[in-house]
Regions:
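Core segments of cupin and vicinal oxygen chelate
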Residues: 12-54
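Acetyl-CoA-dependent GNAT
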Residues: 59-62, 126
Length: 145
């Protein structure tokens, strides 16, 4: 019997003052919208992709306690399957978001960036390459060109 049915959501912790920046970031970068969230005993938002609340954000760090280099747990990054690499790259540049990118032979184009509270995000454009972005097999860091 199969019990695992797929990905449901990821959860990001932050402080209360980080909520607006996180909502704007994921709205601008991924087009996610704030939606229904149960009345928990802490502040937060749920960000929706259509009808699915795929990112839960909980304001559970006291004000000023978050350090971007702080490691909480064993998760290094969150990876997304993506499409439309050229347009996504243009969007990040327009928004002024720093990112690293690479073209990988037989694996596609990848973009790495951080959200406002330091969560590392990876976007995989599996069947795409962006030749003018970076040479095959190399990484371009802190790109805002």
């Amino acid at each position: 019997m199969k019990f695992f049915e797929g990905f449901l959501h990821l959860n990001i912790r932050c402080s209360q003052q980080d909520l607006p920046a996180i909502e704007k970031f994921y709205g601008d970068v991924l087009g996610l919208k704030t939606g229904y969230r149960p009345n928990f005993n802490f502040s937060g938002i749920w960000l929706y992709d259509g009808e699915d609340p795929i990112i839960h954000v909980g304001a559970r760090f006291p004000k000023g306690s978050f350090v971007k280099d702080k490691h909480s747990g064993s998760v290094d990054h969150i990876a997304f399957k993506a499409s439309g690499a050229v347009d996504f790259r243009k969007r990040l540049k327009k928004l002024g978001i720093e990112f690293e990118e690479q073209n990988i032979e037989n694996a596609g184009y990848q973009v790495f960036l951080y959200d406002p509270v330091g969560t590392k995000l990876e976007f995989n454009f599996l069947k795409e390459h962006v030749p003018d972005a970076v040479a095959l097999g190399t990484v371009a860091g802190a790109n805002m060109r």
